[in-house]
């Protein structure tokens, strides 16, 4: 039996949570998630041409369904591009969970792809702090279920 990847665990969690749509734009740091989503019978991946469109669509979907929406982006410019839609949802207390891809951990600090060297490596999630209740970087797969539970609870808790 093959070992499950973190992306498979994440999709399994989202399915159990009742997520039926996930908005995003493909990028090199979310290929594993796209692969796992392609095997899901319960979650429809809605690909957009820009991350700002993905976060705005997720905002609209949450407004209609009254459930937390999920947007997925890749690191670097993908993460910066979702901020407008995330901020718009946050200002109106619309529940949204953002999942941002990252390079494989064995590349940390080696500067492949699109690491942003503003203050320190691996701190890109901090860009979302001003426009959302909480942001995390998950470095330990054991913490993933706890962090996901907390993210959805916070998103759905109103202001």
Q: Which positions does each model-derived feature cover?
A:
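N-terminal alpha/beta PP-like core and its mobile active-site loop of ThDP/TPP-dependent enzymes
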Residues: 1-159
């Amino acid at each position: 039996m093959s070992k499950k990847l973190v992306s498979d665990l994440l999709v399994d969690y989202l399915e159990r949570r009742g997520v039926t749509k996930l908005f995003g734009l493909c990028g090199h740091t979310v290929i594993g998630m796209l692969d796992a989503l392609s095997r899901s019978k319960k979650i429809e991946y809605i690909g957009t041409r820009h991350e700002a469109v993905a976060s705005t669509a997720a905002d609209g979907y949450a407004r209609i369904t009254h459930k937390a929406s999920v947007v997925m982006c890749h690191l670097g410019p993908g993460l910066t591009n979702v901020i407008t839609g995330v901020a718009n949802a946050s200002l109106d207390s619309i529940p949204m969970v953002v999942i941002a891809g990252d390079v494989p951990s064995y590349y940390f600090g080696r500067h492949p792809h699109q690491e942003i060297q503003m203050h320190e490596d691996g701190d890109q999630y901090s860009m979302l702090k001003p426009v959302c209740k909480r942001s995390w970087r998950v470095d330990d797969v054991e913490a993933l279920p706890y962090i996901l539970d907390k993210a959805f609870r916070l998103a759905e808790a109103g202001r």
